[in-house]
């Protein structure tokens, strides 16, 4: 149920009847304060100006045409022309009942789209580090949300599995295998890459061999392809362990590395030349874009093929967008890539649009994100100033959560403690990131993220178990409540019910904007409203069975909404804490 959409349509029709243009925007929003009702329509200001009348006068006329019978108990004009809408308790009660009848909690299925989501994208022969965390978990939350809504989602893990460095890596792997240490060396990917680079920089004979190997690999030589595949396989096997620990839905089947687009690159360069978009400039092939200016104010040149014949990331990204539209039949493509890549993507997409590879009707969206910072406000590093491996970060999260859980539950059996520590530790790392607006940098702080108060995973997980405990104490099964009516008489019952019914609106925003922090804020607010409801509206000691069962149903929908909401974020819930 999307109440905002329902009210928007009703207000829009009333505005048109009052003389507003057919494309008017009612601007119906959830009210910020209880005294302004549940929703507020703010669109009178802009429309009244166009009509040459006072906003309040327009609001009064709109009210004469606005029929919210059975939806709102009160509608009033506030200030210069805001329309405040107070939802009818009977309407709330009926919709709570409806939500409890479906596994989807009453969430409608939008028109199905094929949506490609590009996220995570680690590099081959390197271990995943904290720089991969944001793309991986924000992208996965978007994927889970879109899939829940009913879209066909294609996960695209754009792995860095191609480039000149592979000559160096294959030459080093070959050397290690000759010394019978190939598998052992690859167990430490980071060390393997570092040693290969050191030899490449210091040993000219090795460097020459590496350069020859690049040519052989790129020409499709089977021996070199096999060595390359070995590097990719070992890396992705290690990455899969990290994905599974993070409770992220990516698998090996989702890998669509840079190498996938190699066969397309010569054809794309030739096509861009034939279309007059690409020209020769100082031996290289360049596309000049009027939308981007260089320091001299001239159109910026974007190189798509170097004079030695090599291709660039831009060429691959052009091919990638084309493939996602033509082969994967995407209706929409989302890229979870950090904000530093924004101009690069905009240039690639400008070329894609000019060449007609992806029509304007198919959005290409850069859902960019900021950096993860240490407490000093600088990029998050180890004490020695090195890059933090993602596996090490998750180990520390687990260890800290283990101590925290053991402290609170000294008698908990070891296997149960491990399961709980895993849910809390991994959940804390993910939620701390997901609860921040992705477009900003955020400070990584262990103490804050593992706290049992505030907008944190441990607080949300505890809030869920607290609602479940009401049912354990009530000693009643969900099925026994099915026939019981929902009755809303108290303000706090109404506030909780209205917020519960805003779940679909929240999912819709996350799906449209790719902003999981909106879901985190909603769930945190919901947990707070339940707390207040629990305190002021006795459940187990209610005045009669009818009120008790009605309140139990509100508690039940709260538990289901918290669990489902956290699931769309990839945060595990537990039954007890």
Swiss-Prot record:
It catalyses: tRNA(Arg) + L-arginine + ATP = L-arginyl-tRNA(Arg) + AMP + diphosphate. The keyword Zinc does not apply. The keyword Lipid biosynthesis does not apply. One of its GO terms (biological process) is arginyl-tRNA aminoacylation. A motif ('HIGH' region) lies at residues 122-132. SUPFAM superfamilies: Anticodon-binding domain of a subclass of class I aminoacyl-tRNA synthetases, Arginyl-tRNA synthetase (ArgRS), N-terminal 'additional' domain, Nucleotidylyl transferase. It is an enzyme of class 6 (ligase). This is Arginine--tRNA ligase. It comes from the Bacteria. It comes from Escherichia fergusonii (strain ATCC 35469 / DSM 13698 / CCUG 18766 / IAM 14443 / JCM 21226 / LMG 7866 / NBRC 102419 / NCTC 12128 / CDC 0568-73). It is found in: Cytoplasm. Belongs to the class-I aminoacyl-tRNA synthetase family. One of its GO terms (molecular function) is arginine-tRNA ligase activity.
